[in-house]
């Protein structure tokens, strides 16, 4: 496709908001831009920006690919968002007797937005649709005149007509990728959410699964088990990696800038983790499991200024927040 188509909070409240903006917990770096003349029409400029927050355990690696195409009347930016988002997993207390709980990574969100007027718009992105594959692999190719093609696989079927390509490759066992409903020409968002988790051959279960007798059996050990509550969960090694470890996102957004229009604009990149609380409880005859969604949310945002005329990148600032810190 051608890329031009396209209130006050109560003191007694259980929700606390922790704001961490430009603190010692955040570190940033931008590499010098590298220039590559692809051919007589296209020149590629690349720079990488890293930004993280140790307290929230979120790390952004952003690759900015600026494409100057003499055969096209717009600047093109292919932005690859990668890095790491930790699940925040907190194990149960094995000594808990009749009731126990643990926290796990239920969903991860990544978004890219253009914070400017209509001079800079989001015109394409990858993945483009809901995806339930174990491993998501796609290739974006650019050719003369602003033509963008997105194909499955790491080769993407590129041929001699493609002047530039970028790939995404990430694993999401038992999770699925969805596109944010608010996606439009100014913003694109992806969600990677626990979707189909098996429990010793039973299931699949999700964050909202429910049985009238046993509740949500997502991580329940045994409904008649004689173990303590703190030991009656699915063994840790059987819990999906994204639920207890780290998610390594790789998403691509394509932004278009009108030549001779706004010289500078802002781009905002946000990484977020939603942490659920899973519980089990003995009800005098059997164990009952429950999952409580989004009990703790951490969000890390980096805002960059893009100088389209000189092809320069500047970090304006970072913002971090956490609901229910310390759970």
From Swiss-Prot:
<keyword id="KW-0732">Signal</keyword>
<dbReference type="GO" id="GO:0051715">
    <property type="term" value="P:cytolysis in another organism"/>
</dbReference>
<dbReference type="GO" id="GO:0005576">
    <property type="term" value="C:extracellular region"/>
</dbReference>
<keyword id="KW-0964">Secreted</keyword>
<dbReference type="InterPro" id="IPR036435">
    <property type="entry name" value="Leukocidin/porin_MspA_sf"/>
</dbReference>
<dbReference type="Pfam" id="PF07968">
    <property type="entry name" value="Leukocidin"/>
</dbReference>
<dbReference type="GO" id="GO:0090729">
    <property type="term" value="F:toxin activity"/>
</dbReference>
<keyword id="KW-0800">Toxin</keyword>
<keyword id="KW-0843">Virulence</keyword>
<protein>
    <recommendedName>
        <fullName>Leucotoxin LukD</fullName>
    </recommendedName>
</protein>
<comment type="function">
    <text>Part of a bi-component leucotoxin that acts by forming pores in the membrane of the target cells. LukE-LukD is as effective as the Panton-Valentine leucocidin (PVL) for inducing dermonecrosis when injected in the rabbit skin, but not hemolytic and poorly leucotoxic on human blood cells compared to other leucotoxins expressed by S.aureus. HlgA-LukD is a Ca(2+) channel inducer.</text>
</comment>
<comment type="similarity">
    <text>Belongs to the aerolysin family.</text>
</comment>
<keyword id="KW-0204">Cytolysis</keyword>
<feature type="signal peptide">
    <location>
        <begin position="1"/>
        <end position="26"/>
    </location>
</feature>
<dbReference type="InterPro" id="IPR003963">
    <property type="entry name" value="Bi-component_toxin_staph"/>
</dbReference>
<dbReference type="InterPro" id="IPR016183">
    <property type="entry name" value="Leukocidin/Hemolysin_toxin"/>
</dbReference>
<comment type="subunit">
    <text>Toxicity requires sequential binding and synergistic association of a class S and a class F component which form heterooligomeric complexes. LukE (class S) associates with LukD (class F). LukD can also associate with HlgA.</text>
</comment>
